[in-house]
Amino acid sequence: MKIMMWMIVFITWILAVYAPIQIRGEVKDPTALDDQVENGLNDQILTEYEAFYIYDHIASYLSRPEVGLSGFAKFFRESANEELEHARKFSEFVNKRNSKVVLKNILLASSGVPMDFKNIHEVIDTAIRKELQVTAHINELHKLASQMNDAITQDFLDDFLQEQVNSVSKLREMRARLHLDNSAVYLMDKEFR
């Protein structure tokens, strides 16, 4: 009799807990991305791939025998690989949030990046502009995630924002050092090898 009584209590408890879920339908997934945030993350993936493409283009340019700045080329090849890794991290994040990665076309020709550069100063200025663009986009995405109460995405973006600050600072320091004297280009190129 006691066993029967406990079974009735247990079945009643199960129905009380699980029946409302069935009545109300599917429970909202708190890890799901808002459509606007998902679109913003996909745009950021494109931005990261564009940065990769630009830095790889710069590295190829600097590697030319007539340019001869293999140290700077190495620096920009490493920077390109960093941007590629960022794109992959954003893709993984979108997938983990049960959303879809939508890859878009990379158009270097319409990005305003020259095929050849006048000097290393123009290269550094191009890189700074790109890093500022990447930073601005991540800031906007962070703001959007905040408006959508998406703390998970905000937390994910925080490390990228700090890394952007460091990248821009390093490029600005490089630009300043290059203006010190005529041998700065040679010395910095040697430093990066």
Question: Where are each of the predicted segments found?
Answer:
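Iron-associated oxidoreductase/ferritin-like identity signal
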Residues: 2-193
